[in-house]
UniProtKB/Swiss-Prot annotation:
UniProt xrefs under PANTHER family: 40S RIBOSOMAL PROTEIN S14/30S RIBOSOMAL PROTEIN S11
Assembly information from the UniProt record: Part of the 30S ribosomal subunit. Interacts with proteins S7 and S18. Binds to IF-3.
Keyword field contains Ribonucleoprotein: yes
Protein name: Small ribosomal subunit protein uS11
Gene for this chain: rpsK
HAMAP family: Ribosomal_uS11 (MF_01310)
Length: 129
């Protein structure tokens, strides 16, 4: 087996002033990824990553905590303004957006990029509870 040299790869601190926040809110979880203009990920977080398990991941509070965590990580890289692209039908859409504002970002645009089929695949059957 190869011997470990002991070098640790350090993540260099980029100074990026503006970026894009991708909020993916599904019925089960909310994921927030903050990228630069080219699409390279700067920081990310999700409700599950913040320690919420099961049905608590789909709550607006869990989405708020995930957005705050991703926003604080991105602010360490010098980010100040963001565009927000929201996709999915989940309950964490608005709360994640408010959390990004409360961290201190200046939001320039808000865009809904939820994919809508033009009568594509058949949807799953209705739940009977």
């Amino acid at each position: 087996m190869a011997k470990d040299t002991g070098r640790v790869k350090r993540r260099e601190r980029k100074n990026i002033t503006s970026g894009v926040a991708h909020v993916s809110a599904s019925f089960n979880n909310t994921m927030v990824t903050i990228t630069d203009a080219q699409g390279n990920a700067i920081s990310w977080s999700s409700a599950g990553h913040m320690g919420f398990k099961g049905s608590r991941k789909s709550t607006p509070y869990a989405a708020q905590m995930a957005a705050e965590d991703a926003g604080k990580k991105a602010m360490e890289h010098g980010m100040k303004t963001i565009e927000v692209k929201v996709s999915g039908p989940g309950s964490g859409r608005e709360s994640a957006l408010r959390a990004l504002q409360s961290v201190g970002f200046t939001i320039t645009t808000i865009q809904d990029v939820t994919p809508i089929p033009h009568n594509g695949c058949r949807p799953p059957k209705r739940r009977r509870v």
